Amino acid sequence: MTETLSPSRRGQATPQPDAHPPDARPGFEVYDPEFEAVLGRYARLALVAETDAHEGPVYVRGEDALYFTTVPRAPGGPARGAPRAVIKRLALNGLNLPATPARLSTVPAPVYMPNGMTLGQDGRLVVCEQGTRSEPARISRVDPATGRVETLVDGWGGLSLNSPNDVVVRRDGTIWFTDPSYGYLQGFRPEPQVGDYVYRFDPGSGRLSVVADSFCKPNGLAFSPDERTLYVTDSGANAEPGSYHVDRPHHVVAFDVLDSRHLGPGRLFAVTTPGFPDGITVDRGGRVYASASSGVQVYSRAGDLIGQIRLPGTVNFTFGGPGGQVLFITTDTAVWAAVLATTGAGQSDG
C-alpha cells in the first residue's frame, strides 16, 4: 500500500490523532505548515516487507540494508519456554518496493532477547540484550557479518542490569541507554536489582554512570542535532504487559546535556496520545519523532505537534536510504518506508 500526499489535502483542517480508529488507513496528516517542509512535494508511504520486525531498526548505507530485532516468541508456544528474538537483515534495493522474502536473513549471533540497536562508530551493531533468567542483560557489540558478539557492559556497581531497551551512540563515542524493568514484568528476567535508569557508558574508561533516575519506564532516547539535548520517552502507562494506565507517564522528557556527560533537570517536552511513546528520533531540523499507537507523531523543536505519519502499530523507526530521506518504520508485522524531504540528525548510519 502506498499513499502520496496530494496538494489538496495540505490546506484542509485535520482532526487530532486520537480521533482516528485503530484501523485507520496509512497516510500523512498535517496539523501545522511546518510539517509540509518535512513532507516536501513527493512524500509517500510504502510497504517494504511483511515480517516480524519489532525493534532496533538500523540502516547501513554501505550495504543498503536494514537490520532489526524480531518480535519475541516462545518456541512451541507461550507454555513451552522462554521467549526468544533474533537480529534480522533486510537487503534493500533503493526504493524498489516491496522487498521480496528472499532478501531477509538472520544474523548468526548468539544474542539473548535483543531489542534496541544502533550503529557503532566502528560499523558494528551496538545491541540492547534484555537477557533471560539464565543469561545476563547487557549492552553488546555485534559484527553482523560474522556473528561475533562482544560484551560491553552487563552490570552497574556489581548489580545486574534490568533489561536494556534502547541505545544511542554520541559523537564522542559514549553509549547512552535505557534500562526499564520490562523483562521482569514480562516474566523472562529475575527480580530487579537496580532502578529503571538511563545510563552513560564510556568504552574508553569502562565507566558506567547513571545519568537519570526519575522515570517510571524509560524507553527510547535520541539526541538533538547539536547533542546539547537528550530526549527520552517514558512508557510507564504500559507498566504491565497489555496494560494501559492513562494516569501514568506516556510522554517525552527533554534534558540539557552538561559537560558532555551529565544531564540537567528533566522537563516535559510532549505527551503522546493515543497510547504511549516507544521509539524516538530527531531530524536535521531538530524536529522530534515519537511513536504512538496511531503512528509516528512529529513535534516542532518547541514541542508542538505538527503532523503525523498515520501507521497504527508503529513501534520504532530510523532514518536511512541512499539519500537519508527515508524513515523506516517497524510495526511488529512489517517494515514500512516513509519517503520524506528531510534526513536524520547527525546521521551516521553506514
Which ranges hold each PLM region?
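Sequence-structural signature of mature extracellular/luminal beta-sheet repeat domains
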Residues: 1-350
